[in-house]
């Protein structure tokens, strides 16, 4: 049996403030740090022994991964970071409060911006200080690949080459692989793994720092998938994520 565990980063400071974050490099909150430790303890208790891990270029995912691996005494395993696992780019929405934006534009419009498969928010300017074109960490990325906004389909298309060519083939050499990333980048991976339609993927809500396990047979066919943790608690956390973009 082979296993990949997907984990969304712990609560960030902007999650706490209910802001659109996207590619903004926001740190974990104290709660987020504890969530990462708790996830690590849970996976250690369940006997997971990762030998390879992947994460994004954004510190909330990197620090979640580090927190998990530290608790599991797996700090030594190889970790690959890639911009392709970054969160969906929210364009000019980045930094805005989700509930206040819903008050201004309506719940339906904000849901479209947050989750629509093919409708991106208004792009930011290339010269905007928040733009990836102004960020030295993306200096080695081809300019045509850097987004100024994204719909979910763009995020999926960004991730797929790396998933197909790098992460998934890793299972041939490693029995257990951990991917720490973001709500929308993980949503793209899950869409592919479970063959979820464009319409249904927008209603998938991933709570922070809850391990999502995918088990494969030796031919790398998906056998089953499940969240680690109390089902009722996870359901409540999913509902809370769904309500983030609604009016107060």
Curated annotation (Swiss-Prot):
Molecular function terms from GO: phosphoglycerate mutase activity
Enzyme class: isomerase
SMART domains: PGAM
GO biological process: gluconeogenesis; glycolytic process
Annotated binding of substrate, by residue: 8-15, 21-22, 60, 87-90, 98, 114-115, 183-184
E.C. designation(s): 5.4.2.11
One Pfam family matching this protein: His_Phos_1
Active site location: 9 (tele-phosphohistidine intermediate), 87 (proton donor/acceptor)
Biological or metabolic pathway of the protein: Carbohydrate degradation; glycolysis; pyruvate from D-glyceraldehyde 3-phosphate: step 3/5
InterPro entries: His_Pase_superF_clade-1, His_PPase_superfam, PG/BPGM_mutase_AS, Phosphogly_mut1
Keyword Isomerase: yes
Gene3D superfamilies to which the protein is assigned, alphabetical: Phosphoglycerate mutase-like (3.40.50.1240)
Swiss-Prot/TrEMBL keywords: Gluconeogenesis, Glycolysis, Isomerase
Transmembrane segments: none
Catalyzed reactions per annotation: (2R)-2-phosphoglycerate = (2R)-3-phosphoglycerate
Site for Transition state stabilizer, residues: 182
Entry keyword annotation includes Isomerase: yes
Organism superkingdom: Bacteria
Record-linked CDD domains: HP_PGM_like
Protein purpose: Catalyzes the interconversion of 2-phosphoglycerate and 3-phosphoglycerate.
Family annotation (PANTHER family): PHOSPHOGLYCERATE MUTASE (PTHR11931)
NCBIfam families linked: pgm_1, PRK14115.1
Homology family: Belongs to the phosphoglycerate mutase family. BPG-dependent PGAM subfamily.
Name recorded for this polypeptide: 2,3-bisphosphoglycerate-dependent phosphoglycerate mutase
């Amino acid at each position: 049996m082979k296993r990949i565990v997907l984990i969304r980063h712990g609560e960030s400071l902007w999650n706490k403030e209910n802001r659109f974050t996207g590619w903004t490099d926001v740190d974990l909150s104290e709660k987020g740090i504890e969530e990462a430790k708790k996830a690590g303890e849970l996976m250690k208790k369940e006997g997971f022994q990762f030998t390879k891990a992947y994460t994004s270029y954004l510190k909330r995912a990197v620090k979640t991964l580090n927190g998990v691996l530290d608790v599991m005494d797996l700090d030594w395993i190889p970790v690959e970071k890639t911009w392709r696992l970054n969160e969906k780019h929210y364009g000019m929405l980045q930094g805005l409060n989700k509930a206040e934006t819903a008050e201004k534009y309506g719940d339906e419009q904000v849901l479209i911006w947050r989750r629509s498969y093919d409708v991106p928010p208004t792009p930011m300017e290339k010269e905007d200080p928040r733009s990836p074109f102004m960020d030295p960490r993306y200096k080695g990325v081809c300019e045509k690949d850097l987004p100024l906004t994204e719909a979910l389909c763009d995020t999926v298309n960004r991730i797929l080459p790396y998933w197909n060519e790098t992460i998934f083939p890793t299972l041939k050499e490693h029995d257990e692989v951990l991917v720490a990333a973001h709500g929308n980048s993980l949503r793209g991976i899950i869409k592919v793994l479970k063959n979820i339609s464009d319409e249904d993927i927008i209603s998938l809500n991933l709570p922070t720092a809850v391990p999502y396990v995918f088990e494969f047979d030796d031919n790398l066919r998906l056998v089953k998938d499940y969240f680690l943790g109390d089902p009722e608690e996870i359901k409540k956390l999913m509902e809370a994520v769904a309500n983030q973009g609604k009016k107060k």
